[in-house]
């Protein structure tokens, strides 16, 4: 059973306000979710932080998140801290997320890393619907466990799915299954001695494959690559032995893109 009285839900809908910047049109949330009001660190690029007033996900926790980014909005969504998945005993925790990005809208979805504790079991399913003119940066960073405590790959199972559609046609699907019981997570085809994994997707972003490759190559402590997916969109996969190198790489890519789409930055 969920710790809270009802399923944990979050709804966010944005639009362009009277001053031409992205604002919240409607929102709704149940515990432990909260939303910070948008702030504007760079011109018309809004930033909204998603808050979860809890120590992390437990057995039976189920999150239902729906984000609707209105036409012409430029928005960055972040989280407050690293997300912890605690021991889920004989159950699991889950998140179902649906994101819609409207015409000529830009979304940078940049949560902090996910840390599965010993015996944690997590299921995540994300569906993103775009228009042909939508722009997207979407990432997840998965940690091997409580690395500082030498707790590596002691979780039960972690399964995340990402499905991206453009004008209702699928352009990207990622199915990540990490099951230490059946797979040697440290072999060269998996983490190969690394402890942190970045998965980043860029759709319709003004950056070339060669530019992303250059940022990866100049990132100390990062072993990664970029590949082209459907319609010349890009996907970055990278490994490191800490969260900071991956967060810095992601930030460099995002900064280069936002400088182009928001010229006054």
Swiss-Prot record:
Keywords: Chaperone, Cytoplasm, Nickel insertion
Record's subcellular location: Cytoplasm
Gene Ontology molecular function: nickel cation binding
Main location: cytoplasm
An annotated GO cellular component: cytoplasm
InterPro entries (UniProt xref): UreD (IPR002669)
Function field: Required for maturation of urease via the functional incorporation of the urease nickel metallocenter.
Subunit structure: UreH, UreF and UreG form a complex that acts as a GTP-hydrolysis-dependent molecular chaperone, activating the urease apoprotein by helping to assemble the nickel containing metallocenter of UreC. The UreE protein probably delivers the nickel.
Family membership: Belongs to the UreD family.
Protein name in the entry: Urease accessory protein UreH
Protein source organism: Helicobacter pylori (strain HPAG1)
